[in-house]
Amino acid sequence: MIGSNLSRRERAADARAIGTEGKRWIRSWINVFRCETEARIPQDEAALQRLVCEGRYSCVGQSHSYNGVQVVPGVTAMLMREGGLKTLAYDPASETVRVGASVSVRELKLFLRDGRGRGLLNSGNYMEQSVIGALATGTHGFGPRAVMADSVVELTFLDGAGRRVTLRRGDPDFAHVALSFGTIAPIIELVLETKPLEPYVSVSSMSRLSKLAELKQGAIAANWAVMPYTDPEDPVIMLHALAECDKGVEPTAHPEAKGGGGHFAKWFLKHYYNFDRFLPWFRRPMQRFIDWLDLKQSERVVTDPQDLDYLYDPKPGLKENRAPSITRGLFSTTYTGYNLAFFVPVEKAPAVVKFIIREADALRDLGFYLKGIISVRELPGTAGPVFAANARQPMAAIDLFADPRDYAWLERLQRLVMHYEPDTRPHFGKSALGPDFRAALNSDGQDHLEQLMDIYTRHFPQGNLMFSERVRAMLDVGQPLAGESAADAGLA
């Protein structure tokens, strides 16, 4: 678990537990939300069908979500990523791939790349997630078709009686179930669109927010990050932009970044992560210093189409889970903190970021500091699943980071943004989910959450599929199951 705040003993115990059934800890990423519950590992579909019929359960992938959406106390946890549902089959006629519930993003990308020369339309950059878990919680990249679930053309799940139910794009319930954040589960197979592997022109820049539109010209995809303790009127940004590339261009080695600041600036940016991690109170003066340096740097490369996370990393070769080189020391801070994210209309993103900068800076006297950066990934166009971030308009994902003990401050910042921007939509694996999101998810005049619950009731009349406390609050479906503390205290 990247950046986990577990003790060595807890880490070792969790490592030993992998692949075993019985009492196990289910933890959110960074271990803010957790519970101990009964775990089962389905080795095949028949075993999963039997388990579904035995009693109340929830489904867990790689447990990469930060907000505890995968943590459901008092029920059997189906550990799908550790199971044996490993279907992987490519159909050259339709250029689609069939994927089982135990397949990781890495396994799928390697399968498509090697011998087939294909890739996903888009993805996040964490390779160990289960594909189905990533899609179910709205995982996204940036640029065209950014939300992974938008590439689903068919899905199969088991209902409350263990029977197969298959939905295809265009079926009445499909658009609700394709991205349903654990309320329709277990999804045992997906069929996804793919595309040919291709290089991109990748430009990484360090500049100012006022230059964003100019720097993005000609880009098909843009991911930018703001240093929150630089000038609040015109903060320092790092931009990663992708543009289409002539197919005949060969991938190039990394050039030296160009721009002002000299060797000291280069060294400082490279080692920023270490300062940020061990001296959190020093974050603001460090960023003020960077602001004073007024760095302007850029690099341009052609990406290697064989790179597993080609939408993120411009360095040729199999490099993963990392940012473009001139900003790597800054983005590395995101691997050791709590991450909360939500979506706002793309044209509102600069104003939202400036608002967060001001609100966060006002909390310094209470000991709160944002960690490293505010990340913004742009999702142009619209997506098919009704709960996709950009289901109705282009959106931008706002990612905030803080030390794990400060996660509640991030939830406060989210709520403040929602006061002023009613179209704020949730990231189902990172947002502080709650009733406040109902209006935005139903803003087209239809009660999509009610429709989702109708689908749930129809296929799970037994009520054996359970979902997390925060999802229940957002759906307004009653109190959550009692955890040990509530039960022992007599509160539930």
Give the residues covered by each predicted segment.
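Short secondary-structure capping/junction motifs at helix and strand boundaries
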Residues: 116-125, 163-167, 199-200, 221-223, ...
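C-terminal substrate-binding/cap subdomain adjacent to the FAD-binding core in PCMH-type
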Residues: 136, 153-351, 355-358, 370
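A short glycine-rich, hydrophobically flanked beta-strand micro-motif that places a catalytic Asp/Glu
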Residues: 61, 222-227, 322, 339-340, ...
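Structural signature of FAD isoalloxazine-binding scaffolds in flavoprotein oxidoreductases
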Residues: 67-87, 141-162, 186-193
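C-terminal structural cap/anchor segments
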Residues: 345, 353-400
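Glycine-rich N-terminal segment of FAD-binding domains in flavoprotein oxidoreductases
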Residues: 27-122, 134, 138-142
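Activity-critical C-terminal alpha-helical subdomain
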Residues: 326-328, 408-492
